[in-house]
């Protein structure tokens, strides 16, 4: 008992007795201390030796040491969550999911309010496809921290991505019980609308406007009903909003939106009553926008019809004068048609359109037709969207296509717009017939692409193949088409067919972007893990071009293959490239190759390999050359930089002479310096001759 008591007491250190209290002979200042500390900071510590793990025992030892390090860091400061996350991510990188899970759980015990910790934990489970574990984590997170919106968003997004619509809806319902901010409600509504659940979205809006009873939210609710053509419901929403806010909290924006809705429904008397009711109860200072919109409405439909008629008639007369003076002023026709569409009857609008399209450009050049063709586009869109007359829309498209001189030029947009219209009318054969006619009359890249895109959306892959074949017959130099065709076959799983397409493509005598095609072919073979085929492709490409980027890419491919001897093969490629490019006129490309080689040796080579490449690096020298003007006269001299490679210098006598001249100049400078210094032996300068 006495021993334990004595051990438990703290030992008090003995006070050192100072024998000599006189000041030291050499005093150390604070400045000296700081200088020494700074000098020690500049000392470079050697990097720790790289450890290469060769067997399981060493791996286990490495894991044990790393875990001990992480545990020590955590023990020092448990509240630093980044240490926990790094520890868990390290365990995850080793596929030790259970250990990572345990670490996250321990971290949550330390700080369960840390948002990042929950997110990293759940993301780990999702990344490893542990869906149920991820669900449990999200469930715990939203239960523990229900006011963190990020948890709810990610939880619902995960459920939706998994196709669990009912589960996502259940999560949203739990979220709404907490009455979150407005954006959360909008997310729920948009979720339901993505699955065409209009009735559910309406129910959510009903709850939303009660939780967040702002004017803008009531307006959004009404516009939602209007957008889905529930006009009676939209009117009821506006009426409920007016009743909800009453006379004490009236807002002009609500009444403006209500009036515009009724205006769109052509209920002009209702519009007038709404404006008058609001203006009678809202002060003029707060009703500027309301009064402005009422004035515009009255100019359109109300008692001020005479004023409106004068304004419209004046503008119409102005446009008539402009189009009479220059019938081919298509901008004036556009303005005129915009005015007529906003005010006149459908027959009047059609009459003006017919007058406008009658002014065909006199010259059959595409640049003169670009503005004119949009008259036909707008005419067709008006008939389809405003007049709701599909038959007349079809006639407009057909008339425009008959008018265009397809032998000289065409407008792919007109063919595509027509085909899209027929698809909207569910006349797929008509759309195909139109596009087939277009590529028969006037084949064009945009037409082929549009037709192929249509058939792809319809999953008609055989038709896509035929279209690609015709496309490539029309433009065999188009590399993009070859690549897209091969990618289609790859997606369909026909690898041999895709390879045959690539072989046909690279055998073409003329290509617009051959480098893109070759890269795509090489990437395709790499994806198929055909190492030998890829190597042969690089060899074929190097027979056609000796570009430095091809050599570098070839070397990097050999290095990335991961097979035994890949480093040696990569080095062999660099050596072969260096030998090949000795006669290359572009010295910058040769320098680029050597720099890439040096980077490779820095990472994988030995000291001798690095020194060998360093010896091949060129010297940068400044030179002068004559410059000639465009007329052939002498324009003086210009300086430029050139590169002298050691291999070239050894084979050129003039470069040897230049090196000797530099040495002689250096010796001359040393002799002059020696003559100026009397303490130096003057006889040393006599050795300057060569």
Curated annotation (Swiss-Prot):
Q: What does this protein do?
A: Involved in pre-mRNA splicing process. As a component of the minor spliceosome, involved in the splicing of U12-type introns in pre-mRNAs.
Q: Where in the cell is it found?
A: Nucleus; Nucleus speckle
Residues covered by region (Disordered)? 667-690
- Family listed: Belongs to the crooked-neck family.
InterPro entries, alphabetized:
HAT, HAT_Syf1_CNRKL1_C, Syf1-like, TPR-like_helical_dom_sf
**Which Pfam family would be a valid example here?**
HAT_Syf1_CNRKL1_C
Q: Where is the composition biased (Acidic residues)?
A: 680-690
Enumerate the UniProt keywords alphabetically. Answer: mRNA processing, mRNA splicing, Nucleus, Phosphoprotein, Repeat, Spliceosome
Question: PANTHER family annotated for this entry?
Answer: CROOKED NECK-LIKE PROTEIN 1, PRE-MRNA SPLICING FACTOR
The subunit field of the Swiss-Prot or TrEMBL record says:
Identified in the spliceosome C complex. Present in a spliceosome complex assembled in vitro containing CRNKL1, HPRP8BP and SNRPB2. Component of the minor spliceosome, which splices U12-type introns. Interacts with PPIL2 (via the PPIase cyclophilin-type domain); they may form a trimeric complex with HSP90.
Disulphide bridges: none
Looking at the keywords, is Repeat present? yes
Annotated GO MF terms: RNA binding
Mediates interaction with HSP90: region residues: 250-467
Q: What name is this protein filed under?
A: Crooked neck-like protein 1
Q: Which SUPFAM superfamilies match?
A: TPR-like (SSF48452)
Which residues form the HAT repeats? 61-93, 95-127, 129-161, 163-194, 196-227, 229-264, 266-300, 310-342, 344-378, 388-424, 459-491, 493-527, 529-560, 565-606, 608-646, 648-673
